């Protein structure tokens, strides 16, 4: 085998490896070996043993204070917002969000979207529209 043929075989091997590395993620390999999970980002003892609920940035409910009792929650619950996203969004991997995420508006998808997962939204109305007129309305959970 001459050096040019060997070079072509090596380039082809690199191209095949590059193509197949884009089709799979590392999550399947890492999950079987215990690399993710346990003390990872999505557990109650998350990033650095405690930056996610119930020990860190998720509120004061564990310390005896009710969440949003004084109308100081992250999501007010009323309003209108429009977000438009156009184009292809190739996303692969694991996403973990710790803390409070203010979500305002609605999400609308058009077209074919293949997705899996779960979303939980909880809070109280902090805009003065509660049953008492100053943000102490009934809590909601979606």
From Swiss-Prot:
InterPro entries for the chain: Chorion (IPR002635)
Swiss-Prot/TrEMBL keywords: Repeat, Signal
Superkingdom: Eukaryota
Gene Ontology annotations of biological process type: chorion-containing eggshell formation
Alphabetized Pfam families for the sequence: Chorion_1
One cellular component (GO) term of this entry: egg chorion
Signal peptide: 1-18
GO molecular function terms noted in the UniProt entry: structural constituent of egg chorion
Cited function: This protein is one of many from the eggshell of the gypsy moth.
Entry similarity comment: Belongs to the chorion protein family.
Protein name per UniProt: Chorion class A protein Ld12
Naturally occurring in which organism (per UniProt): Lymantria dispar (Gypsy moth)
């Amino acid at each position: 085998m001459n050096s040019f043929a060997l070079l072509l075989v090596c380039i082809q091997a690199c191209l095949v490896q590059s193509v197949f590395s884009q089709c799979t993620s590392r999550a399947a390999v890492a999950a079987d070996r215990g690399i993710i999970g346990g003390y990872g980002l999505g557990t109650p003892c998350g990033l650095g043993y405690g930056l996610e609920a119930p020990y860190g940035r998720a509120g004061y409910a564990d310390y005896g204070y009710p969440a949003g009792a004084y109308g100081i929650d992250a999501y007010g619950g009323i309003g209108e917002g429009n977000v438009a996203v156009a184009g292809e969004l190739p996303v692969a991997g694991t996403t973990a969000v710790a803390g409070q995420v203010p979500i305002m508006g609605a999400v609308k998808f058009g077209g074919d979207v293949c997705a899996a997962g779960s979303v939980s939204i909880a809070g109280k109305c902090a805009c003065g529209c509660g049953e008492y007129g100053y943000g102490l309305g009934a809590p909601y959970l979606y």
